[in-house]
Amino acid sequence: MTRTATGHFTEKERFFITPDGTKHEYKEGSGPYEYLMGALAGCFYSTLASMERKGEWKEVSITANGIKRTVVPTTLEHTSLEIVGKGISDKNEFEMLVKKTAEECSVFQTISKVSAMDVVVRFEDDEE
């Protein structure tokens, strides 16, 4: 399946457009690597949610962080995902599915070719 984004760059604007016509601007604090981290979080959740499960989930939040190398090429050196589950009825099943997702998520696997990867799961219900 082909995925497409078209970048447009002038002195005044920097953005890319997706096939649905959505314009995504590159601004201070929302450049290519922020979009990459968003793509990682989105792909990871989509893969996780597609897994067959017995338990119920109320909410899942995924924070993706990447640290770039300081030498050229400045690819990611270390990437981490913090996955926070709320209202997870079967925590053991959820953790097992997260591990399986790390093996199957295409964006996670692509980034893992250049970066060390960490995944941390925590449950907010446990902190109340």
State where each predicted segment sits.
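Extended beta-strand/beta-hairpin segments
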Residues: 1-38, 48-128
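Alpha-helical metal-binding/catalytic segments enriched in His/Glu/Asp
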Residues: 43-44
